[in-house]
Amino acid sequence: MADTEEAYGMPDTPVEAEPKELQCEPKQDNQLGASSKTPTSPPAAFTQQGMEGIKVFLHERELWLKFHEVGTEMIITKAGRRMFPSYKVKVTGLNPKTKYILLMDIVPADDHRYKFADNKWSVTGKAEPAMPGRLYVHPDSPATGAHWMRQLVSFQKLKLTNNHLDPFGHIILNSMHKYQPRLHIVKADENNGFGSKNTAFCTHVFSETDFIAVTSYQNHKITQLKIENNPFAKGFRGSDDMELHRMSRMQSKEYPVVPRSTVRQKVSSNHSPFSQETRNITGSSTLNSQYQCENGVSSTSQDLLPSSSAYTSLPHESGTIYHCTKRKVSEEPAEHSYKKPYMDTSPSEEDPFYRSGYPQPSSSSSSTTSFRTESAQRQACMYASSAPATEPVPSIEDISCNSWSSVPSYSSCTVGGGMQPMERLPYQHFSAHFTSSSLMPRLSNHAGTQPSDSHSMFQHQSSHQAIVRQCNPQSGLQQSSALQPTEFLYPHSVPRTISPHQYHSVHGVGMVPDWNENS
């Protein structure tokens, strides 16, 4: 591009222009009818034959003069930064039918390096070698003279960079050096281009547009002027000068920007959907990721959000982690010889006891498929045992439906001032309405019975259906309609304010006690 400048005789700097090249046309000013308020066009730095009548006026010259009096500074970054004030000009005197190319370049104003100290700029040394000059061609080029004279010609998209390997065509500058922008008007050739030796052109320089390139603003007065006049800096207005200066220096540095959606995804991924606390995730659609359980049941995060009728989980006090290992059973509910009705509380009640943290299956699927869990097997073993209490208690891992006789019954549960250490089989909280009187009449029917089926289970059905437990295949089948309301383990009328630390002694084994609302 430097060869291009030499081809049509562009001077390196405006100070090197010879006096004979500085031409001014007074009669053209009279023809334009410029008023006293409009500044006259400065003489062209370089003009060839046929380009004498072209006049250029700097837009917002008063604003440029304000910056020039203080010492204009322009931010340069690796990615490129636009100039403020923007370089805009009004061009007149062009041939309306001739095509022109308008372009800019920025050249060093001198061969010094500057520093800002004691609230002023001073020379600190010799300038660094200048980078090869780049030309910024206006996007509308080439265009007819009528097009250029119709409106302001703006170079606001021009960007300044300090990246010497910049591939985007930005103007490359060195920090702490003074530069002078220049405007070139070139008459397009027959190929709508320029660069040949016969190309006519003229160069216009406005001395009030020179500036020092910086990576952050040095003079707080420049910071204040930029904030007051730049419409994109209105967020900084209203603060004190030093704070504005500090913030502007911070804004000039390049920091990585993390998208909000990524942060929201990271925050939401740290919370399990099976937790006790209710969390409402209001992220974007990218948060609908799949959560896989051990049993192969998959659902989206929206399906796992707890609702008003959802169950809440209860943390295990013993510290043992129970995993959901639901297994399908091939038998139908009607094929079992003996079933004990067992009903859960209504999902509309917010009773925190014996609630599952996993989503309940739909009624259509639960009517044909039954599931059982390890916790249900442990409860069945706990209630069906009739062995004497003198036998040793096995560990939690050894308890299964094949060890009925080895598990002693819960003959009594006493809760004192503090919780006893859980050395044996951990128990779970029950309701405060346990009574021993209602248990004894029914205990005689099952005192001497031992279950022979090792596959007893809970029929895990929907929340509004009765959940039955298989106990003894020799006993008759009891229908849930023939049972009294006092025979359900969790009636719908259980109060919500039940203290988990109130118990009554249970003196029998093998059966779930009854209670009612008045007990």
Swiss-Prot record:
Annotated segments matching region Disordered: 1-46, 254-282, 293-312, 326-372
Keyword Cell inner membrane appears in the UniProt entry: no
Subcellular location: Nucleus; Cytoplasm
GO cellular component: chromatin; cytoplasm; nucleus; protein-containing complex; protein-DNA complex
Compositionally biased intervals (Polar residues): 29-39, 262-282
Compositional bias ranges of the Low complexity kind: 298-309
Gene3D superfamilies in the cross-refs: Transcription factor, T-box
InterPro entries named in the record: p53-like_TF_DNA-bd_sf (IPR008967), T-box_DNA-bd (IPR046360), T-box_sf (IPR036960), TF_T-box (IPR001699), TF_T-box_CS (IPR018186)
Keywords for this protein: Cytoplasm, Developmental protein, DNA-binding, Nucleus, Transcription, Transcription regulation
GO biological process, one term: regulation of transcription by RNA polymerase II
UniProt biased composition (Basic and acidic residues): 17-28, 328-342
DNA-binding region of this protein: 63-238
Comment, domains: The T-Box domain binds to double-stranded DNA.
Function field: DNA-binding protein that regulates the transcription of several genes and is involved in heart development and limb pattern formation. May bind to the core DNA motif of promoters.
Oligomer status and interactors: Monomer. Homodimer (via the T-box); binds DNA as homodimer.
Name of the protein: T-box transcription factor TBX5
Taxonomy of the source species: Eukaryota, Metazoa, Chordata, Craniata, Vertebrata
